A protein has these predicted regions:
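A conserved acidic beta->alpha catalytic loop
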Residues: 26, 33, 41-51, 69, ...
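Acidic helix N-cap motif at the loop->helix transition within catalytic regions
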Residues: 18-21, 46-54, 97, 101
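Short, well-formed alpha-helical segments that are part of the catalytic scaffolds
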Residues: 15-29
């Protein structure tokens, strides 16, 4: 396996035993075969650690790391990123899935245009893995200003070129840590949309950010800008408020019915 062609896939895992096997199977079903999947177990208690270990024994492209104590997805992703060996970095949460051609289509898109940072459209599934009938896309190009305005990319769709972006590490915040990553990566490269539905996002699982109300979202966005990004209180408030406005815009412009 050549690092020149390798995709390192980052997957934090905490008590997703109901979904994680299907998530990993969607990686194994990729038409692009040069990948490593780095699963970071965040002290699972539902048997999913043993499940992934069994899958690792059958497929050496799967690597399992286990945190000594529960530290959250940000710390898990940071560790996986330090361990990653690939030219490309991709992300998949342990309750989401990819379409078989996801990696192949996205790499071809980035190589054809010389892009270092990209994302794709995806469809939403409910917690029972049934389609909600919603397709989520986004702006064709996201600049630094655009990324601060709103977290447009779905985590399960993002890919960037490690050789151009370098090692990315974020502060150990408990929510919006994927957004914190994109705010780091966008400093190195604009983000471009491959407007094809290449992933399936599981919405509404207990504990996921989509199950909380607007009050919690406001608090977490302020915390992201104030503490992870170390912005002043007034700037953090303005960025938080802007995110609320652009969140409405996303619903109007970029969430479509299938």
């Amino acid at each position: 396996m050549s690092n020149k062609d390798l995709v390192s896939i980052i997957m934090p895992s905490y008590n997703c035993g109901r979904y994680i096997e299907a998530s990993i199977r969607s990686v194994q079903a990729q038409t692009y075969k040069e990948w490593e999947l780095i699963v970071v177990d965040d002290c699972n208690t539902d048997g999913s650690y043993e499940m992934v270990q069994a899958m690792q024994r059958d497929d050496q492209r799967i690597r399992v790391l286990r945190q000594e104590r529960r530290q959250g997805a940000a710390t898990a992703r940071n560790w996986a990123l330090r361990e990653a060996r690939g030219r490309w970095i991709a992300f998949l949460d342990s309750d989401d899935k990819w379409e078989p051609e996801k990696l192949e289509r996205q790499i071809a898109f980035m190589e054809e245009h010389g892009y270092a940072f990209s994302y794709t459209a995806y469809q939403e599934m409910d917690e029972h893995l049934q389609p909600t009938g919603k397709l989520v896309t986004g702006p064709r190009r996201i600049t630094t200003v655009g990324m601060y305005a709103f977290c447009w990319p779905g985590c399960l769709t993002v890919m960037y070129a490690a050789s151009k972006v370098g090692l990315v590490q974020i502060k150990p915040i408990h929510k919006n840590n994927d957004y914190a990553l994109w705010l780091k990566v966008i400093q190195k490269a604009d983000c471009y949309l491959l407007d094809e539905c290449l992933a399936r996002y599981t919405r509404g699982r207990s504990g996921s950010i989509t199950t909380h109300g607007y009050g919690a979202l406001i608090k977490w966005h302020y915390f992201l800008f104030r503490h992870a990004e170390e912005r002043s209180a007034p700037v953090s408030f303005l960025l938080m408020f802007g995110n609320l406005i652009f969140g409405v815009l996303k619903k109007l412009m970029y969430i479509k019915k299938l």
